[in-house]
Amino acid sequence: MEAFSDSFRTDLSQLMRWRRDVRRFRSDPVDEALLMQCLDTFRLAPSVGLSEPWRIVRVKSPELRQKSIENYQTANATALDGYDGEKAAMYSGLKLSGMSEAPEHIAIFCDDSTTKGSDLGATTMPEMRRYSVVGAINLMWLHARSHGLGMGWVSILDAPKLCTDLDI
């Protein structure tokens, strides 16, 4: 396997350093062709047994976007209740989501029950499907960042409720 140039490695290293969780988004629409390029990076991602367990949902309707935001707000309030004193003050001061400002909402799920790949590599380590999804998200994130797009990772959610709200 041939090595990449020093210049490429420097640029890649810089891209990885600048891949950060964004909480403050521009509100102008994301170019549709560019968004599709970002989503297409999932096709390049490795996955256990070629299972491609990721399931991607664009949350476009204002009603579903609002439900997602409210889901976050409820889960965030519950999380805040778990802190006292200084930790509660610090937590409440964090900007943990930019969902209201973000021009796109994309929900990404792992299909743990996929039959694609015939369980190759997942029989003994089923968590590899989830690792595959995380790896694919990282590729999308790097691609988006290389085009000047920011992404944010929202994990403060009631996932079962989100699945119900999105009819997953």
For every predicted segment, state its role:
Residues L35-R43:
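A structural motif
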Residues L94-S97, T164-I168:
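A generic local secondary-structure boundary/capping motif
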Residues R19-D21, G49-P53, E101, R145-H147:
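Short glycine-enriched loop/turn motifs at secondary-structure junctions
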Residues M1-M36, E52:
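Specificity-determining recognition surfaces
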